[in-house]
């Protein structure tokens, strides 16, 4: 797996708050394995569906947390974190929303709707509207 540092993240998301200096870029297959674990965990906790008290920012934060836990499990890692974060942005419809973001390498970024969880495409306007990012 490739690695990046805070500089790569801040080029894409200048407002990003990074808790680590170095990150491992996961593969799509690895992220999709977390999709399955996340869905199982949310079902067990009875919070898979959207609720006013467990909404998009809670789900995005939970998915980011689970990726960090799974990434750190097997053995000592070469980097401090995994390149999965959460972003808040304004949708094309005008409302705020929180989802996840993953760096697959230093320039390839994909978004995740954690309420699926499923891969998500942001419009150009939505991408530019990101006002918070945390890794």
Pin down the residues of each PLM region.
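A structural boundary/capping signal
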Residues: 1-135
């Amino acid at each position: 797996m490739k690695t990046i540092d805070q500089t790569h993240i801040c080029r894409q998301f200048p407002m990003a708050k990074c808790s680590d200096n170095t990150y491992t870029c996961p593969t799509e297959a690895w992220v999709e394995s977390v999709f399955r674990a996340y869905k199982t965990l949310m079902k067990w906790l009875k919070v898979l569906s959207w609720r006013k008290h467990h909404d998009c920012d809670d789900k995005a934060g939970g998915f980011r947390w689970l990726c960090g836990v799974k990434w750190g499990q097997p053995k000592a890692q070469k980097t401090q974190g995994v390149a999965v974060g959460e972003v808040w942005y304004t949708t094309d419809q005008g409302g705020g929303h929180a989802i996840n973001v993953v760096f697959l390498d230093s320039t390839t970024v994909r978004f995740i709707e954690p309420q699926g969880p499923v891969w998500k495409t942001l419009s150009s306007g939505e991408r530019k509207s990101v006002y918070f990012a945390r890794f």
